[in-house]
């Protein structure tokens, strides 16, 4: 869940576009819905557009020439701040293959090769300014119990957290120290 906004979010969405007109129309539509342009340090040569939703949460409208997300649906990626080790952790934790592992950046995608990617941008990592506004929720797959899934996560390097952020979920921290909630079953 969302907490108080303190600086740039460590997780944001990347939306894909199919043409320059689509990128322009998507930006215009999101601005009509209350979005706003935001500067997160992008350069003048960047071809993606960075917006913030009405609550100030950043999202990127990706240019149509971006080949990395070209096979993804409109929600191209959930982009996370994190190390290369974190990408490998999540690949093992959820059983999705690494589809990118270069220059300390990593990404995973469902084994079918379809759907959005989970990406980690590598260093330098953003400063942690209190609680992250957003965090991942995971559910055990394939009829596994939450306790069995938690034991797997702990074996991969996750640690238990005393902090309970979500009702009905087990709180833990991934290998980069990010809050994660393990829910009993997919919702």
Q: Which residues make up each language-model segment?
A:
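Ordered, small/hydrophobic-rich secondary-structure cores
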Residues: 1-38
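Short, conserved charged micro-motifs
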Residues: 20-26, 85-87, 143-149
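Short, positively charged, low-complexity/disordered linker segments
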Residues: 130-144
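Vicinal oxygen chelate
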Residues: 31-92, 97-129, 140, 150-187
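Short, solvent-exposed loop/turn segments that connect beta-strands within catalytic domains
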Residues: 6, 21-22, 112-115, 129, ...
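Short hydrophobic/aromatic beta-strand micro-patches
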Residues: 14-18, 79-81, 137-141
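Short, solvent-exposed beta-strand edge segments and adjacent coil->beta transition regions
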Residues: 8-12, 73-77, 131-135
């Amino acid at each position: 869940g969302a907490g108080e906004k303190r600086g740039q979010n460590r997780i944001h969405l990347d939306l894909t576009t199919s043409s320059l007109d689509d990128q322009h129309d998507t930006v215009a539509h999101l601005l009509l819905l209350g979005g706003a342009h935001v500067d997160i340090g992008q350069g003048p040569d960047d071809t993606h557009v960075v917006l913030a939703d009405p609550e100030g949460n950043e999202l990127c409208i990706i240019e149509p020439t971006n080949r990395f997300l070209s096979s993804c649906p409109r929600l191209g990626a959930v982009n996370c701040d994190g190390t290369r080790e974190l990408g490998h952790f999540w690949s093992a934790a959820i059983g999705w293959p690494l589809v990118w592992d270069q220059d300390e950046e990593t990404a995973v995608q469902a084994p079918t090769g379809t759907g959005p990617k989970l990406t980690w941008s590598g260093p330098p990592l953003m400063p942690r300014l209190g609680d992250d506004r957003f965090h991942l929720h995971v559910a055990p797959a394939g009829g596994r119990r939450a306790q069995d899934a938690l034991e797997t996560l702990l074996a991969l390097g996750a640690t238990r957290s005393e902090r309970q952020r979500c009702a009905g979920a087990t709180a833990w921290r991934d290998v980069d120290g990010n809050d994660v909630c393990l829910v009993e079953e997919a919702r």
